[in-house]
Every structure is written in structure tokens, then in C-alpha cells.
A protein has these predicted regions:
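Stable alpha-helical elements in mature extracytoplasmic
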Residues: 44, 53, 74, 78, ...
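Pocket-lining segment of extracytoplasmic ligand-binding domains
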Residues: 105, 128, 167-171, 175, ...
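Secondary-structure end/capping motifs
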Residues: 238-318
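Short, glycine-/small- and polar/acidic-enriched structural segments
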Residues: 30-176, 192-198, 213-214
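Conserved C-terminal helix/tail region of periplasmic/extracytoplasmic solute-binding proteins
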Residues: 309-344
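Short, solvent-exposed loop/beta-turn-alpha elements that line the ligand-binding surface or hinge
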Residues: 58-65, 218-221, 291-299
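Short, low-complexity disordered leader/linker segments with a strong preference
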Residues: 1-34, 338-344
Length: 344
């Protein structure tokens, strides 16, 4: 199996930090025989983890294609790597995808499919008083990197309840820090709450006695929203249509496989952490984390558009409006380009 992992990860309490080291950042690599894929070492990214580990993707793209994996802990970092042409396809949340699409004027990114729905929660300290909106003044609440999906959701939730962060003249301290740092500060009692994805949400509950105030999907229509999307770099997609087509087919096959083999999928995820990170998560954390999300290839388009509306209301999308036309890959509209490429 032609798979290489371009990362070294250390684990503190469970996962302490991620150091990203690219095997190659060259945009001059021959792209016909390699696909560089980015994802996170987290439950919501079960599709690439399980599908690569059990060989579905390798069989789908063929043995002549090398799959090079790169692990990240931040969506905005993934998008910057897309811009640097060091990644070809990636699994990432809607917030960074939207920002990246607009930053590139719609030229660099296409959404191919969904990968997960749900899987984020608002976790609070048991004595924080955050179970009542009246008690938010002066509280310290964390989310991962600014403008990522959880950050947008947290800030929109505050705005929906007539609250503002300190930097906007409000009364709530919003801290944008990495998931491992959120874990550390929560353990020390230095933050009152955190809006985080799985498995971090369940780790805060099971290991640090946090209280899950609610799962984010409870705030969405039909209790579903796109939390992880499969995207491709547009020029890679145009230059390698058959490879991307096979990747997408394998992606959908993996979604079906995971939903039909839940226990084995959890076992594969646990083995992945042990093999690539040196330590896994307790089985009970993996079980609960998986139960808090849905693995799906549906991008839930309306939720992506709603994310954009919310990000725009927070001032994340600039002052001149935004246009997401073309963000979703439509194979029929790209048929001519594909035929041209396949015919040489």
C-alpha cells in the first residue's frame, strides 16, 4: 500500500500537540501519480482515516497512485496549504472552506461531498453557571482557531442571545486556541466553557467532568449540519478528473462501509491513533464520540450556505458581500474539461 504519513504527533493528556511536516511542498510534482490528502486525527474525519487504513481508497484509485497523507489540527491551516499547492484533496469544516473559496475569488476550491454531520458540542464547567444565558457576562469561552466552524457557531450563538465578545464591546471573553490547549485550560479551570468538535468534547466530559450543555445539531433545522466536507483544489481536479472521480467514489463507498461496520470502524480508528500517534483514546470516549455525529457523503448544502450567512453577520467575509456560486462541484458542468483531459 503506497501510503505515507507526513506528520509527527505528540500526546499529552490524550493528544497534546500536532507538528505538521510536509513530505513535499513542491507544486512541481507530477500530479498524475500522487494524491496528497489532508485531514485531522479526529472522529469527524473517520472517512479518510478508515478508508485509507482499510484500503478502500487505494483500491479505488489504483496501485499506481501514491496516497500521501498530511494531518492537521486547524481548518485555516489546511486552506493555506491548498493555496500553497501542497495539498490536492482535503477534509475540513465549512467555515474555512467558505473563507478559502472567497479569498481565492472562487478559483481554488470545490466542495466534492460531505463527510460528517454534527459532532460539535458546547461543554461547560459544572460550576460555571453557563447553563443560564444570564450568567455569560465575564465568562471565558474557548473555540479553536478564529473563523473555523466552531468559532463561527459560538460567536453566532452569542449574537443570537444578544451577547458580544469583549473585542466587540461586549462582556464575554472568547479565546481562540488549539484543541489541546483548550483541554489544558479546561483542566486547570482557566476557561468556563468550550465549543469543540469530537473527540475533544467527549474528552472534556469524561476526563475533566465537563457538562455537555448541548450538541450543536440541536440548534440546526432537522438537527443536521455539515461539519466536515471533502474538498479538492480546483486545478488538481481539472488536471486529474479520473483520479478525483475515483477518490469521490471511494469516499462514498467508505461512508457506506463505516455505517455498516460501526464496531470495526471504531477499531480501525483506535489502531490509527496507536500507529501514527503512539497512543489511542479510551474505548468509551471513541464510542461516545462516534455516537455524537453522523458519517454522510451529503454536503447538506443549505447548512453550508447558512454557515456563510452567519460568518458574514460576524464580519468574517468582508464588507462588500459575498458570492458562493460555483463552490459545489457539479460534474455535468465540468464534463467538457474532463473529456478534454482524458483525451489528452
Amino acid at each position: 500500500m503506497k501510503i505515507s504519513v507526513a506528520i509527527t504527533l505528540g500526546i499529552g493528556a490524550v493528544i497534546a500537540f500536532a507538528i505538521i511536516t510536509s513530505l513535499s511542498n513542491s507544486s512541481d510534482q507530477a500530479n498524475q501519480d500522487i494524491v496528497r490528502v489532508a485531514f485531522f486525527p479526529s472522529i469527524g474525519h473517520a472517512v479518510p482515516i478508515v478508508g485509507i487504513e482499510n484500503g478502500i481508497f487505494q483500491r479505488g484509485v489504483g496501485d499506481q497512485i501514491k496516497i500521501e497523507t498530511k494531518l492537521f489540527d486547524s481548518g485555516p491551516q489546511v486552506i493555506e496549504s491548498i493555496f500553497a499547492r501542497s495539498i490536492d484533496v482535503a477534509y475540513v469544516g465549512p467555515g474555512p472552506v467558505i473563507n478559502g473559496f472567497l479569498k481565492s475569488h472562487g478559483n481554488d476550491i470545490k466542495i466534492l461531498a460531505g463527510a460528517a454531520s454534527g459532532g460539535a458540542s458546547f461543554i461547560i464547567q459544572p460550576d460555571s453557571g453557563l447553563d443560564s444565558i444570564e450568567n455569560f457576562d465575564g465568562k471565558r469561552i474557548a473555540s479553536p482557531q478564529i473563523s473555523n466552524s466552531q468559532d463561527v457557531s459560538l460567536r453566532y450563538y452569542l449574537a443570537s442571545n444578544d451577547l458580544k465578545p469583549i473585542e466587540k464591546g461586549g462582556t464575554v471573553f472568547v479565546l481562540n486556541i488549539s484543541n489541546p490547549d483548550i483541554y489544558t485550560l479546561f483542566a486547570k479551570g482557566e476557561i468556563d466553557g468550550a465549543w469543540v468538535p469530537e473527540p475533544w468534547a467527549t474528552m472534556l466530559v469524561q476526563e475533566l467532568d465537563g457538562v455537555r450543555l448541548f450538541n450543536e445539531e440541536k440548534l440546526w433545522p432537522n438537527e443536521e449540519f455539515a461539519s466536515v466536507l471533502l474538498i479538492a483544489r480546483t486545478d488538481y481536479l481539472e488536471n486529474n478528473p479520473e483520479l478525483v472521480k475515483n477518490w469521490l467514489k471511494s469516499h462514498k463507498e467508505t461512508v457506506v462501509w463505516i455505517n455498516s461496520n460501526a464496531d470495526e470502524s471504531k477499531s480501525i480508528f483506535e489502531s490509527f491513533l496507536k500507529k501514527h500517534m503512539g497512543k489511542s483514546l479510551p474505548t468509551k470516549i471513541i464510542d461516545e464520540s462516534f455516537s455524537n455525529l453522523t458519517i454522510t457523503s451529503d454536503p447538506i448544502k443549505n447548512s453550508v450556505l447558512t454557515f456563510a450567512e452567519r460568518a458574514d453577520s460576524l464580519g468574517y467575509l468582508g464588507r462588500s458581500g459575498y458570492n458562493l456560486d460555483g463552490i459545489f462541484y457539479q460534474p455535468d458542468l465540468n464534463l467538457n474539461a474532463m473529456v478534454k483531459q482524458l483525451n489528452g
